[in-house]
Amino acid sequence: LTCVTDKSFGGVNTEECAAGQKICFKNWKKMGPKLYDVKRGCTATCPKADDDGCVKCCNTDK
């Protein structure tokens, strides 16, 4: 499985998931007007969202 770890104007960065990590996740929370803290990567289980954040998980490449 290959997950996106970062998106920018220059393209995307990806990582190959380790054995046992079969889910890609995107975790983001609002830090201010039009400002978000975003984390992406591989995981074994879908993480829970913080009170002021959101999480999206999938099990397909990129």
Swiss-Prot record:
GO cellular component terms, A-Z: extracellular region
Cysteines paired by S-S bonds: C3-C24, C17-C42, C46-C57
Protein location: Secreted
Tissue: Expressed by the venom gland.
Keyword Membrane: no
Single GO MF descriptor: toxin activity
InterPro entries per UniProt: Snake_3FTx, Snake_toxin-like_sf, Snake_toxin_con_site, Toxin_cobra-type
Keyword field: Disulfide bond, Secreted, Toxin
Annotated Pfam families: Toxin_cobra-type
Family according to the record: Belongs to the three-finger toxin family. Short-chain subfamily. Aminergic toxin sub-subfamily.
Subunit text: Homodimer; disulfide-linked.
Function: This protein shows a synergetic toxic effect in that it enhances the toxicity of other toxins.
Protein name: Synergistic-type venom protein S2C4
Gene source species: Dendroaspis jamesoni kaimosae
Lineage: Eukaryota, Metazoa, Chordata, Craniata, Vertebrata
